[in-house]
């Protein structure tokens, strides 16, 4: 039976050595997580599985005695990675629920955020329909923060088989992620990407400066659709401007589909009881069969570096995790399988104030996306079309979209390449 619990008692509910899975992003139940961290010394061997972290809850300087794991170093999880404090599971986001449902990762406690019941409808998952649900089905103990300021979302209805053991009540603004500031480089990339996308296409993109710039650049398009893992404020802008109608989607017609809402109060107001917005689990947002069935799916992802053959590293820089496998491969392959779909890797040509080329002869980190899946690579300098091209032509096309000061060096490297 579900019972109210005071946050002061959290350390008495969590056993030594427990693995606690917590909601991610804006769906982090901060009333619970912040108190758990405050009480961390009362629970020896405390382990936390976190996702995309937007809050400051898990700052490395305030989490001594706690070990962390995640599927990437996204958001503020990168602080833990930089400090050598997080163990990474290199898993496709679409397969992440299976880590828990198949017993590869065994959760003891799950802490999640819910929206209260409204007008006879049950509680809602609110801001995230994700792997936390699968973890909760396997956990010994499930504790919910029922937050009055969390939007009630369709598709996010609390599953009837999900047991909530304890809950706390909260009334606080969920963790916010404001739209990113975009500079001239991001705007140049966005202009090139927008020119590739036809009216009526269905868009997948992430969060951050380049995705936000691309969504802004799509402001003159018509009848676009959205099917994405993450949805932010810029998607709400396009819906309210009449650019996104979802009217030409071949799957989930009329619905903006996503798994996570990462934005501000403006996005939360847009999402609350919006029948045209549907939150779905990773099996739907990232499922291979679902994505392949969406005609004209344009998947837009980014990279830390791309080599001359089209291999993508979206995980590490200088041997430190700063990204993750995430949903990139799910969407790259889904878009390639979509009728009329395209996969786009959009990134600046350089890093570190222009001192390092992101287009490289050989990756310095892991291969996240294979060259056999490569389609379009876009930088501020141009568009490299790699699909259907042999290696020598790929190298020439990639060099052409590199920053000019690095092209000669890349050409020399390409001349000596055998594979």
Could you describe each region identified by the protein language model?
Residues 1-419:
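Conserved alpha/beta enzyme-core scaffold
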């Amino acid at each position: 039976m579900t019972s109210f619990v005071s946050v002061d008692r959290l350390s008495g509910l969590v056993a030594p050595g427990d693995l606690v899975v917590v909601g991610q992003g804006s769906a982090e139940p901060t009333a619970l997580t912040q108190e758990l961290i405050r009480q961390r010394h009362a629970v020896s061997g405390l382990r936390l599985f976190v996702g995309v972290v937007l809050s400051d809850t898990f700052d490395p300087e305030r989490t001594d005695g706690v070990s962390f794991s995640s599927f990437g170093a996204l958001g503020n999880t990168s602080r833990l990675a930089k400090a050598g404090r997080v163990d990474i599971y290199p898993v496709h986001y679409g397969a992440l629920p299976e880590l828990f449902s198949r017993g590869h990762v065994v959760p003891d406690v799950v802490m999640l955020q819910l929206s209260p019941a409204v007008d006879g409808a049950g509680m809602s998952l609110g801001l995230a329909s994700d792997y936390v649900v699968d973890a909760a089905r396997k956990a010994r103990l499930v504790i919910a923060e029922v937050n009055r300021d969390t939007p009630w979302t369709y598709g996010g209805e609390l599953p009837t088989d999900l047991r909530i053991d304890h809950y706390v009540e909260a009334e606080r603004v969920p963790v916010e992620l404001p739209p990113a500031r975009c500079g001239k480089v991001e705007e140049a990339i966005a202009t090139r990407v927008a020119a590739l996308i036809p009216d009526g296409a269905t868009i997948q993109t992430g969060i951050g400066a380049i995705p936000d710039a691309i969504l802004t650049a799509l402001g003159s398009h018509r009848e676009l659709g959205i099917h994405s893992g993450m949805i932010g404020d810029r998607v709400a802008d396009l819906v309210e401007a009449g650019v996104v109608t979802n009217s030409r989607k071949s799957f989930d017609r009329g619905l903006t589909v996503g798994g996570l809402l990462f934005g501000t109060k403006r996005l939360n107001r847009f999402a609350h009881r919006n029948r045209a917005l549907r939150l779905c689990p990773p099996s739907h947002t990232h499922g291979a069969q679902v994505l392949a069935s969406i005609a004209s799916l344009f998947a837009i992802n980014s990279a830390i570096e791309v080599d001359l053959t089209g291999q993508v590293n979206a995980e590490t820089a200088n041997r430190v995790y700063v990204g993750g496998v995430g949903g990139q491969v799910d969407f790259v392959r889904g878009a390639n399988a979509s009728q009329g779909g395209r996969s786009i890797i959009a990134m600046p040509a350089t890093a570190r104030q222009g001192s390092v080329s992101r287009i490289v002869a050989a990756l310095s980190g892991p291969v996240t996306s294979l060259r056999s899946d490569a389609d379009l690579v876009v930088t501020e300098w141009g568009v490299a079309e790699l699909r259907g091209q042999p290696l020598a032509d790929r190298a020439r096309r990639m060099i052409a979209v590199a920053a000019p000061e690095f092209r000669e060096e890349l050409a020399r490297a390409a001349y000596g390449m055998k594979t």
